[in-house]
């Protein structure tokens, strides 16, 4: 009261700050604020009310100006999360990383030390507003590639590192179609890759490693390995709108109901769910393509049909660590 803080703001703060207090916090503050002659008699050191009459709290403009001095910010459309890049001490631009609670708390602490009364929720709200520029990691990567020369079959060379027991040319043809469809689904909301690409072979034959290395380092974060195949969760639905490839290990462990769910997932064009702590459902495009590994040739048991699966039994795979992928060539051709 004496420092000029509005009763409603002070009461709201106290209720949250002393949530475990059994007494009537609001009644205590009503009693204190009855002494109207004391209101605003003491200056708040280093802090003065804003002209906008917002009870002395930092305005949106104040917070945005402060954030401009701290780092670069962007909103990742694939992950639905804010990212930040902090400049190094030498002035070099830093790499973008996802914002976490510790970083937001640090921003609040730094701004408070500058003499600003700021709500941490206001900082979060601004970071999740139009203040942060939109960033699409897939557009950023693919538009930066050099055009394909129209001749060199980079995808064919990549497919040739997998040696299958069936006709090699058939495998290479289907892999090329699956890979091109996976890239198309990143950019066209009406395109969904309906087929599930599966490598069958013994353990230790580089199946998962080869699939994992399909994505370039810049997009490696968008490869997801699903090892718990016993159930399909809400998080699995969100993964359809976030990742490029979802790899299901040991898919022979899938039960009949899970197989049916996965078949339905492959044709689902959008994900319409509410994320944890979000206020509204999000209507997000299905961008992921599914792949998998198994050592069981007889993993398909659906008598109604298996046209969504592209299974190939391998005899061997060239060591992915000694046979690196020509990412620029492969993806300029696929794009």
What are these regions (language model features)?
Residues 129-241:
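P-loop NTPase catalytic core of nucleic-acid-dependent motor ATPases
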């Amino acid at each position: 009261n004496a420092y000029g803080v509005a009763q409603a703001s002070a009461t709201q703060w106290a209720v949250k700050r002393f949530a475990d207090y059994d007494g009537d916090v609001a009644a205590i503050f009503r009693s204190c604020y009855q002494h109207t002659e004391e209101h605003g008699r003491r200056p708040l050191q280093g802090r003065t009310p804003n002209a906008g009459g917002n009870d002395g709290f930092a305005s949106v403009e104040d917070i945005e100006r402060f954030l401009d001095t701290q780092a670069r910010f962007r909103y990742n459309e694939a992950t639905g999360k804010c990212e930040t890049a902090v400049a190094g001490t030498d002035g070099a631009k830093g790499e973008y990383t996802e914002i976490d609670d510790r970083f937001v708390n640090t921003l609040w602490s730094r701004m408070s030390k500058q003499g600003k009364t700021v709500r941490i929720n206001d900082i979060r709200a601004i970071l999740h507003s139009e203040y942060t520029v939109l960033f699409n990691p897939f557009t950023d990567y693919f538009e930066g590639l050099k055009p394909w020369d129209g001749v060199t079959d980079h995808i064919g060379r990549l497919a040739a590192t997998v040696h299958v027991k069936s006709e090699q040319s058939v495998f290479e043809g289907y892999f090329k179609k699956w890979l091109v469809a996976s890239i198309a689904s990143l950019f066209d909301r009406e395109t969904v890759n309906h087929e599930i690409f599966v490598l069958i072979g013994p353990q230790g034959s580089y199946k998962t490693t080869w699939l994992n290395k399909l994505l370039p380092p810049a997009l490696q974060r968008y490869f997801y390995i699903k090892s718990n195949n016993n159930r399909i969760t809400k998080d699995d639905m969100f993964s359809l709108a976030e990742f490029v490839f979802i790899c299901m290990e040991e898919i022979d462990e899938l039960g009949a109901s899970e197989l049916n769910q996965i078949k339905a997932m492959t044709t689902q064009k959008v994900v319409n769910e509410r994320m944890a702590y979000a206020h509204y459902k999000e209507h997000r495009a299905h961008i992921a393509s599914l792949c998998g590994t198994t050592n069981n040739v007889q993993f398909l048991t659906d008598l109604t049909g298996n046209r969504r699966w592209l299974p190939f039994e391998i005899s061997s795979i060239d060591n992915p660590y000694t046979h690196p992928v020509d990412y620029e060539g492969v993806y300029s051709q696929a794009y």
